[in-house]
């Protein structure tokens, strides 16, 4: 196996692991990293990105395996465990439905560098606004989120279908806007990542099944494992961070990255097509 390709795969796994759960959009960063490193052909990169996203998802599953098992086991009887299971299902449904109905439109019409840049910049401004004017937490326990709160966060997650918006950004800031504490909305966002990434990955994997080749399994495994461990570390670090800090730094970063997308798209330095 080519050593340079291995290094590139590790870097891509690191990028995915860092950006998947932070409110900064993993997609834009993966496109940038892949273009700068000239990483794989388009078709092979699609498959690789599916695998590193699954690595990120499984890191969440492993971290919360006890709570997930309790939630699944308690789904048939009243209690906090069933409440979490139902809330995740409620929040998952709106984005799943909209994504299923409009997936072709999103890929063919919305995925332009200018939409991506707009998603980054507008998302950054919204984070600033919520942090400064709309954050009034009334609930600090993810297990006690109401069905209405879950549905509202699910509606916010629909905005993440706009490229550059960020799934985690939409759900975290949406949760904060509707009265969840930073930690509660961040943890709930982690849980929502499981069905969203899982469903999207399985669908994308089925569509890309003809591009999968046995000789690529080594590089796919490297990306998967790297993403798993980096996501695991970032997940814990983010929860420690939000217990003491706001999301304002991420807002400024989003705006700066959005301007970078605009500049590189206008000059043609980076190919932002997918």
Swiss-Prot record:
What transmembrane ranges does the database entry give?
4-24, 46-66, 86-106, 109-129, 145-165, 188-208, 214-234, 250-270
Matching InterPro entries: UppP
Superkingdom as given in the UniProt entry: Bacteria
Q: Which GO terms describe its biological process?
A: cell wall organization; peptidoglycan biosynthetic process; regulation of cell shape; response to antibiotic
Disulphide bond pairs: none
Keywords from the named record: Antibiotic resistance, Cell inner membrane, Cell membrane, Cell shape, Cell wall biogenesis/degradation, Hydrolase, Membrane, Peptidoglycan synthesis, Transmembrane, Transmembrane helix
Q: Reaction catalysed?
A: di-trans,octa-cis-undecaprenyl diphosphate + H2O = di-trans,octa-cis-undecaprenyl phosphate + phosphate + H(+)
Any signal peptide, and if so, which residues?
none
Presence of the UniProt keyword Cell inner membrane in the record: yes
The terms describing its cellular component in GO are: plasma membrane
Q: Principal place where this protein is found? A: membrane
Regarding the membrane, this protein is recorded as: Multi-pass membrane protein
Instruction: Give EC number(s), comma-separated.
Output: 3.6.1.27
- Subcellular location, in the record's words? Cell inner membrane
Among its keywords, does the record have Cell membrane?
A: yes
**Which class of enzymes does this protein belong to?**
hydrolase
Tell me a Gene Ontology molecular-function term this record carries. Answer: undecaprenyl-diphosphatase activity
| Functional description taken from the UniProt entry | Catalyzes the dephosphorylation of undecaprenyl diphosphate (UPP). Confers resistance to bacitracin.
Q: Any miscellaneous information on file?
A: Bacitracin is thought to be involved in the inhibition of peptidoglycan synthesis by sequestering undecaprenyl diphosphate, thereby reducing the pool of lipid carrier available.
Q: Which family does it belong to?
A: Belongs to the UppP family.
List the protein's name. Answer: Undecaprenyl-diphosphatase
Lineage of the source organism?
Answer: Bacteria, Pseudomonadati, Pseudomonadota, Gammaproteobacteria, Cellvibrionales
Q: Which gene encodes it?
A: uppP
């Amino acid at each position: 196996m080519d050593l340079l390709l291995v290094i590139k795969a590790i870097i891509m796994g690191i990028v995915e692991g860092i950006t998947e759960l932070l409110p900064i959009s993993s997609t834009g960063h993966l496109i940038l990293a892949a273009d700068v490193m000239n990483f794989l052909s388009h078709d092979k990169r699609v498959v690789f990105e599916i695998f590193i996203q699954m690595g990120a998802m499984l890191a969440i599953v492993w971290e919360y395996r006890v709570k997930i098992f309790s939630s699944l086991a308690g789904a048939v009887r009243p209690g906090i465990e069933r409440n979490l299971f139902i809330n995740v299902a409620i929040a998952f449904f709106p984005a799943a439905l909209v994504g299923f109905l409009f997936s072709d439109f999103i890929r063919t019409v919305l995925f332009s560098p200018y939409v991506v840049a707009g998603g980054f910049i507008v998302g950054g401004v919204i984070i600033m606004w919520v942090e400064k004017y709309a954050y009034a937490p009334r609930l600090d326990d993810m297990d006690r989120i109401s069905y209405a709160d879950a549905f509202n966060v699910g509606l916010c997650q629909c905005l993440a279908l706009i490229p550059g918006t960020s799934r985690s950004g939409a759900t975290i800031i949406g949760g904060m806007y509707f009265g969840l504490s930073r930690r509660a909305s961040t943890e709930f966002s982690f849980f929502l990542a499981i069905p969203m990434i899982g469903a999207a990955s399985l669908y994308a994997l089925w569509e890309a099944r003809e591009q999968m080749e046995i000789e690529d399994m080594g590089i796919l495994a490297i990306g998967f494992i790297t993403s798993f461990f980096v996501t695991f570390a970032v997940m814990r670090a983010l929860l420690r961070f939000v217990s003491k800090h706001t999301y304002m730094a991420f807002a400024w970063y989003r705006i700066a990255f959005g301007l970078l997308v605009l500049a590189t798209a206008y000059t043609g330095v980076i190919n932002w097509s997918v």
